[in-house]
Amino acid sequence: MTDKTVRWEPLKSTSVFSTRVFDIHEILSRSPDNQDHTFYSLKASDWVIVVPVIHSPDGEDEFLMVRQWRHGVAEESLEFPGGVMNPGEKPEEAALREMLEETGFTAKKIYHGATVSPNPAIMSNHCHFFIAEDLQDTRETHLDEDEYVTVERIPVQTVQERMG
């Protein structure tokens, strides 16, 4: 092990491009050996992902998942409900809101699983993961105007097998 520092000193950050979803910032930073370098970072809101679990008396538990089109990969994606946090919103509040909006389900129990930096090399935000249990179906979704989602119950075992 070494005592050498790896810390860079951020000197300046300038927004160079903005969209409704993220901003791109040009960042000037000074390296540990006193050299200045330019980097680019995506600045976006934190977001949440909720893993809704439907417990079955026979032990065949299921996950509640959503299928939707993802423009980044230009294909359908089967994923857990989630989305961007609103300003001032707590992660747990966002998790419950997103699950209700996308699936029509609420949860009596919700647990924080983890908070991660999805791509800290170029992104400034965090993703908060939650597990939701004791679900109730309100039978009413509240999708964004550009959101087209189908809700699917997928056996936990199937999801585990697909993950390899």
Where do the PLM segments sit?
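A short, amphipathic edge element
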Residues: 2-14
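Conserved Nudix-box catalytic region and its N-terminal flanking loop in Nudix hydrolases
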Residues: 5-8, 39-42, 51-54, 58-97
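Acidic, metal-coordinating catalytic segment for phosphate/diphosphate chemistry
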Residues: 11-51
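Short glycine/serine/proline-enriched coil/turn segments at secondary-structure junctions
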Residues: 19, 72-73, 120-122
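Short beta-strand micro-motifs in enzyme catalytic cores
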Residues: 23-27, 62, 126-128, 150
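Short loop segments at secondary-structure junctions
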Residues: 32-33, 54-58, 69, 133-137, ...
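Unchanged
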Residues: 37, 47-49, 83-164
